[in-house]
From Swiss-Prot:
This is Macrophage migration inhibitory factor homolog. Substrate binds at residues 33, 65. Its main location: secreted. It comes from Brugia malayi (Filarial nematode worm). GO terms for cellular component: extracellular space.
Amino acid sequence: MPYFTIDTNIPQNSISSAFLKKASNVVAKALGKPESYVSIHVNGGQAMVFGGSEDPCAVCVLKSIGCVGPKVNNSHAEKLYKLLADELKIPKNRCYIEFVDIEASSMAFNGSTFG
């Protein structure tokens, strides 16, 4: 159930379907989860200031049942920052990514929780 949310000041009409699909693939591979469970949500066109500047920036959250934590978050960060820099031109120093480990019993899909 990985869920990657990106809040950015990049205009919403600049967020392509191809980016969404690539982000889904990157998250699935990074976490070793089936892509059929991955959700990508981009909130473009947000009024944002990062470091006192309105230059392109983002604040992101990656939520997952397991597969995130101190031992693996640096690896995930490397892949996600590369995605954001390559595809949306958001520099690594203009983005925060929060990693959240969700309890299976706190997330539902298809009518029931995962645990």
